[in-house]
């Protein structure tokens, strides 16, 4: 049997010399191509979803007890409350806790939803013209049929108080069907946006899949 000749070192050297510029060119074109690709709306949307899915996934352990207390009172899954909190204000890290549309507090309530749409100033998007002292008055909220809750019994139902805000969100979501398992309907009632529903449900399902680990982390931090 004849011994097969391998590729000589000289030939290999020439192959490397020839292929190296081609490899570098392909690499540069790939970078340029991606830079152009990310300008396409569909790709931008995909990138946003990936970023939102990987950024700040962890539920702050100190909040879990509040979510669970609200769940006990209203029958709304605490993981759903956490998902809303994550989407609305990134677990209260948004500054200020006031949107350009007028939504207020940790869970971004429009004043008319918090105080009640039967308030004489309410209409449109729900910003209303409600005096500040009336916005946090349990008596006024009861009078106008709002969803604000004085969860800590300090005499105020304050959307800027975290416990009050979480309980108020649970109250609203329960009334919208979440306590009866109509999760998607309740989320849509909270914000009439399909994208909003998609985002909240994404984190809700994520937290549901991690619920044992999240609860264990909350317990160990106490």
Residue spans for each PLM region:
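Intrinsically disordered, low-complexity regions enriched in Ser/Pro/Gly/Gln/His and often acidic
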Residues: 5-7, 27, 107
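Catalytic glycan-binding domains that act on GlcNAc-containing polysaccharides
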Residues: 38-222
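N-terminal Lys/Arg-rich, disordered targeting/topogenic segments
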Residues: 1-13
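Hydrophobic membrane-insertion alpha-helices, especially the h-region
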Residues: 14-32
């Amino acid at each position: 049997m004849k011994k097969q000749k391998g590729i000589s070192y000289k030939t290999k050297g020439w192959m490397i010399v020839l292929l190296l510029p081609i490899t570098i060119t392909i690499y540069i074109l790939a970078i340029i191509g991606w830079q152009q690709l990310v300008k396409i709306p569909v790709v931008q949307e995909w990138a946003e979803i990936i970023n939102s899915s990987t950024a700040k996934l962890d539920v702050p352990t100190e909040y879990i007890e509040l979510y669970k207390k609200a769940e006990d009172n209203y029958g709304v899954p605490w993981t759903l409350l956490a998902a809303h909190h994550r989407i609305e204000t990134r677990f209260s890290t948004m500054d200020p806790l006031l949107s350009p549309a007028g939504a207020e507090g940790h869970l971004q309530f429009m004043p008319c939803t918090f105080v009640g749409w039967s308030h004489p100033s309410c209409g449109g998007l729900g910003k209303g013209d409600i005096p500040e002292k009336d916005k946090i008055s349990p008596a006024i909220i009861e009078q106008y049929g709002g969803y604000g809750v004085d969860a800590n019994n300090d005499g105020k139902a304050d959307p800027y108080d975290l416990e009050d805000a979480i309980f108020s969100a649970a109250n609203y979501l329960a009334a919208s069907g979440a306590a009866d398992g109509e999760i998607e309907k309740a989320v849509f009632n909270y914000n009439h946006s399909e994208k909003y529903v998609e985002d909240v449900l994404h984190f809700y399902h994520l937290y549901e899949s991690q619920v044992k680990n999240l609860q264990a982390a909350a317990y160990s931090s106490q």
